[in-house]
Amino acid sequence: MLLSDRDILAAQSAGHISLDPWTPEMVQPASIDVRLDRYFRLFNNHAYTYVDPAENQGALTEQFEVAPDEPWILHPGEFALGSTWEYVKLDPSIAARLEGKSSLGRLGILTHSTAGFIDPGFEGHITLELSNVSTLPVKLWPGMKIGQMCFFQLSSPAEHPYGSKGTGSHYQGQRGPTPSRSYENFYRAHIDD
């Protein structure tokens, strides 16, 4: 069940959903707006000749920080990692999705490539996969609305929520834009002809 504004407020009050900082004015009819932090990661295009999700390529991205009152420019065709300002906590009975803001989408800004789902039990800053598919550079300001989270009540609490042993939860408690850790539990099935 998708939570309405009143359900979001009740879940926050009961401790099932936590966003820090909590700003009630960010609550929308069926979502809550989240804001952009000032930390970003860009690809270091000279460190590797290719990306391999099975390998630890620690120098693949470099983190940088912009001043709280300074914009960062995302150029056409550029991809960068960012993060929400809000630290998010979900209890085992709530899952969430991160969606873009339509006003930013109309400017060519994509908030996430594929990783919009947030598991029950997750806590941390949400890493954003930012892309500019427009033909002009776009200023991104720390603290601006960058996306919206909608919440789903599970039919029963997850038996093994994100962060519990054996779930491969390698982003639990993340701070800032966190690079891929796909190599930590890379899986590849053997395919026969």
Swiss-Prot record:
Q: Does the keyword Nucleotide-binding apply?
A: yes
The gene name reads: dcd
Q: Where is the active site?
A: 129 (proton donor/acceptor)
The UniProt site entry described as Important for bifunctional activity is assigned to: 116-117
User: Which pairs are disulfide-linked?
Assistant: none
Organism field: Bifidobacterium longum (strain NCC 2705)
User: What protein am I looking at?
Assistant: dCTP deaminase, dUMP-forming
Q: Does the keyword Transferase apply?
A: no
- Which chemical reaction does it catalyze? dCTP + 2 H2O = dUMP + NH4(+) + diphosphate
Alphabetized InterPro entries for the sequence = dCTP_deaminase (IPR011962), dUTPase-like_sf (IPR036157), dUTPase_trimeric (IPR033704)
Any Pfam family matching the protein: DCD
Q: What class of enzyme is it?
A: hydrolase
The record, for SUPFAM superfamilies, names: dUTPase-like (SSF51283)
